[in-house]
């Protein structure tokens, strides 16, 4: 489990009704089984639209937290957190011009700690920065002043929390007065970490109370998960469609449709045609380069994305690779690997397409959705004309499959 713990005529009539009921059940099962089969009727179509954002000298293109902040008038801003400096960059999406660099402090009265795990920008006066060192979230304004600190140690039932983050593919969500946050597999649970780790929690911003979700990581890990690992075994992504959360786990073919309170869970088949076999790696090289190589070759599932404009979902997939030892595996990993595909699912989670993207050209880890379509970064370090001083994106639209 992944949820925490008379007359002859009458007889003839009943017989006929039972047979009719049986026939109806068979028909329903037949239709259901066929409706779960992929129907590849659509694809991603590359367009001529390309947008470019100039990068600060205090960051590289290896951005881990990319999101969109919309004002009440509909104006959109692209928000990036520097991977080097204590800075957040806010761009005007209509002009791609840098509007503001928000500088926050690591120490002192306004200090948020030595390292943050991404950013959630709600408005110019409400920006959340989760700490990567202690279980707390700082709220700052656009001047970098810390307005509040939100600690979370454990919930009322004694569930122990660990640090959270807000990154591309696994952001925090502010829903009404509650922050919905990711939790990774929890080492504070000891021998029960492989089975009892909650996928996340919510924090009531009025009371400060935190509550762990009943929904736990699906039991794909071995009981001795403390053994050496690549770090991708517990990789999780999620999106929110305004009603439910959808979770994608690296080594699980299924998606999980989860109610907002995380008490109702439905498994949804979402298998890629580019992954034949999916297994958690059991032999991990001790050499760092070889381990990173395995990370770049291992097949698994990536981010799940909700497109609210078209009411569809996109699931990123990493097929198996066979790479040369001459590769820079650290750069390749931080560029979203070499190849990837994206599964397209309709609003009812039927697979309607899957597109395999060309190798070493697009970044599976940097993307955003607008009313125009899906923008995917083409700032891949192996692309011959790549410019390290900018972050560029190509617009893709979904259309009829060729």
Describe each PLM feature range.
Residues 296-344:
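Loop/turn-rich, solvent-exposed surfaces of beta-rich toroidal or solenoidal domains
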Residues 194-208, 331-348, 389-401:
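Beta-propeller blade signature
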Residues 54-88, 305, 313-318:
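Beta-strand-rich domains and repeat architectures in extracellular enzymes and scaffolds
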Residues 110, 271-278, 283-286, 350-370:
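Conserved blade-ending motifs and adjacent loop-strand segments that build the rim/top face
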Residues 97-128, 132, 153-163, 357-363:
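Blade-loop segments of beta-propeller domains
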Residues 134-135, 142-176, 182-189:
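Asp-box/WD-like beta-propeller blade repeats and closely related beta-sheet repeat scaffolds
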Residues 51, 98-106, 147-159, 211-218, ...:
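Beta-propeller fold detector
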Residues 31-32:
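C-terminal motif of bacterial Sec signal peptides marking the signal peptidase cleavage site
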